[in-house]
Amino acid sequence: MVRILLFCLALLVAGPAFAIKPLAQYWARPDTLGLKYQSLTLTTSDRVHLAAWLVEPSAGAPDQHTTIVVAGGDSGNMASNIFTAATLAGAGYRVLLFDYRGFGHSDAFAINQNYLYYPEFATDARAALAEARRRSPSQRVGLMGFSMGSLVGSEAAATTHCDVLVTIAYPASPQHVVAHYQRIRPERPIILPAEAATYSQVAPKVNCPWLFIAGTDDQATTLADTLAVAHAASRRQRREVLPVPGDHPQSMGAFSEDNLAPRCLAALRRLLASPAAAGKG
């Protein structure tokens, strides 16, 4: 019952999709769920300091020799992802959670909430990947992005050494996302950064194995757009699409809801076992 109440609170704190609404205060920390962790401070290439939590695999779990960096969505802070961290830690993964600039306890950053995303968030994801690699140079390092986090996470994976990429509710076409929300809530503009004009060039540059998890009823980040990106990959690029029931918010529970997490963990293990990702671990 306590876990259910905490999960409901996490959803409430996270707020609506595609509205950049960072929170400074953590509603919980990993040890709220009994997870062993340490607090870190990361430094980006442009000298911004980011708050982070490094969560250890749960006692008795089989060591996967893999660190998963989690890039969260566009609201709340890294506390919103502690249930995902608990699932991954319980399966034997080390997990690095971090706050984007302007989120949580990271350095301040001026944010216009009408933006879909900021390119600087990709810089933050790169810093998290680099720190995970520095701490475990002989192990695999992957990135898991949720919604906006999958957009900036894919940019990071395209330009930084990454052994596996997992995206949940992936905005394959930022322009389609904007068009969708302009139809259903025309009173509120959504602004794309200039860099979004060339975002379609990012996916072909992601050479690590990539797992797409997409909601079958997601009207914002559609399964059709996700399949188009996956099918456009070259034969050398390993891509797997896992459809899950539900809309955009429901798909975000891929690694925290009991009815979805086992399938998603199994897909992650398959991808890590592929030759492209199995060189370490």
Residue ranges and their predicted role:
Residues D74-T87, Y100, A224:
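The serine-hydrolase catalytic nucleophile loop
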Residues V206, F212-A214, D218:
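Short beta-strand/loop motif that positions the catalytic acidic residue
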Residues Q237-G281:
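C-terminal catalytic histidine-bearing segment of alpha/beta-hydrolase fold enzymes
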